[in-house]
Design a protein with these regions (language model features):
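Hydrophobic alpha-helical segments
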Residues: 1-330
C-alpha cells in the first residue's frame, strides 16, 4: 500500500463531517486567503489530544484573529478528528484547509505537500518532552522495570504519547512493538488523548502511562516520573497541499502577529517561524522505529473507539467565540 493509497483508505473509513472538498481548480489558483477559503470558511483540523470543548475554547481566540485578518473569510471552524491519522488525512486531501499536526505527522505529511506555517513556543522554548510515569508506590523505578506491565499511551502517531515513549523503551532494551502491533515485553492501552492516558494511570487501570510533559500533574504526589525524552519540537500549524506561496506567507504573517491576549488564552508564548532542520530529531526517531505513513494500517491503529478514523466537528469557533483552557501539544 503506497502513501496515497493509505490516505485514501483512511478517508474511506472516515465519514469526514466536513464541507470544503471542492477547492479551487488547478487552472485558477486562488489569489487571496478569502478565495482560498471555502465559501468564506477556513476549516482547521485538530487531533484529539484534549476533549472537544477544551480544544474549542483554546483555539477560539486564534481562530477569531485569523478570521478578522482577511477579506472574504467569515469564520474559522475547528474540526476535531478522533484519531491522529484522520487529522492528516483531512488536510492532505483538502477536507480542511489548515490543521494542527503532531510533530511526527508533520514529518510524514511533508512528503504529501503539507506546508508547515508556524511552530508553537511555550515557556520560552520551541520544544517539550515525553514523560513515562507510574504510581509512587509502584515497583517500577526504571524503564526496564516496565516489562510485563500495561502502559497507557496516547496514539501511535502522537509524538510524545506514542513514538518517543516507544523509542525510550526500545533504548532500554524492551521490545516496543510497531504502530500496528503490540510489544512482546509489555501491553499498550491506547487512550486517545494525553489527559486520558494520565487518567488511566490515576484510576489504576494501567501500571504506567506516557504523555506530554504539559499533562503531568503538579499537585498529585501519587504520580511520579520514571523517564523523560530528549527535547521534541512543538507541533506546527500547517496548510493543505498546493496552497500558493503568497497565501502561505499571508497566513504566517498573521499568525506571527497574534496578539498577546489570544496567545494567553491559547496558553503559548508565541508562534515562531519553522526553521530548516527543526523536525530532524523527530524524523530520526521515526526512521529508527521504522515509522512511515504507508506502514500504518488504519484498521489496527487502535482497539479503542475513541481513536477510530473519523472526524467530528467541534462547536464552531467564529469571530465571537469564547476563550480559555490548557496549552496544546501532541
Amino acid at each position: 500500500m503506497d502513501r496515497r493509497t493509505f490516505l485514501q483508505a483512511v478517508g474511506s473509513t472516515s465519514a469526514v463531517a466536513v464541507a470544503g472538498c471542492a477547492g479551487q481548480s488547478e487552472s485558477e489558483p486562488p489569489e487571496s486567503v478569502g478565495e482560498w477559503a471555502d465559501d468564506g470558511s477556513i476549516e482547521f483540523g485538530l487531533p484529539p489530544f484534549q476533549d472537544a470543548e477544551q480544544l474549542n475554547e483554546q483555539y477560539a481566540p486564534v481562530f477569531e484573529w485569523l478570521a478578522d485578518g482577511f477579506d472574504g473569510v467569515d469564520t474559522v471552524k475547528g474540526v476535531q478528528t478522533t484519531s491522529y491519522s484522520a487529522t492528516v488525512e483531512s488536510v492532505v486531501n483538502g477536507h480542511t484547509e489548515m490543521a494542527n499536526l503532531s510533530p511526527i505527522i508533520s514529518v510524514l505529511a511533508a512528503e504529501d505537500g503539507v506546508n508547515p506555517l508556524v511552530i508553537n513556543w511555550s515557556h520560552g522554548a520551541d520544544s517539550y518532552y515525553s514523560y513515562i510515569a507510574t504510581h509512587a508506590e509502584s515497583d517500577i523505578d526504571a524503564l526496564g522495570d516496565i516489562a510485563g506491565s500495561t502502559v497507557a499511551m496516547v496514539d501511535p502517531l502522537s509524538s510524545s504519547g506514542g513514538l518517543f515513549p516507544r523509542y525510550m523503551l526500545t533504548q532500554a532494551g524492551l521490545d516496543a512493538g510497531t504502530v500496528n502491533s503490540q510489544p512482546d515485553d509489555f501491553d499498550i492501552q491506547w487512550a486517545g488523548g494525553h489527559d486520558a492516558s494520565l487518567a488511566a494511570l490515576q484510576n489504576g487501570h494501567v501500571d504506567a502511562a506516557a504523555y506530554g510533559d504539559f499533562q503531568h500533574p503538579t499537585d498529585d504526589d501519587s504520580i511520579v516520573k520514571v523517564a523523560e525524552s530528549d527535547p521534541i519540537p512543538f507541533d506546527p500549524l500547517v496548510a493543505k497541499p498546493n496552497t500558493p506561496d503568497a497565501i502561505q506567507q499571508a497566513l504566517i504573517e498573521r499568525l506571527l502577529n497574534t496578539p498577546e491576549s489570544a496567545l494567553e488564552a491559547h496558553r503559548i508564548d508565541r508562534f515562531g517561524e519553522v526553521e530548516e532542520g527543526t523536525y530532524d530529531p523527530v524524523r530520526g526517531v521515526a526512521e529508527e522505529m521504522g515509522v512511515e505513513i504507508e506502514t500504518l494500517d488504519p484498521e489496527s491503529e487502535s482497539d479503542d473507539d475513541s481513536t477510530t478514523n473519523s472526524t467530528s466537528e467541534t462547536n464552531e469557533s467564529t469571530t465571537n467565540a469564547s476563550t480559555s483552557t490548557n496549552e496544546s501539544d501532541t
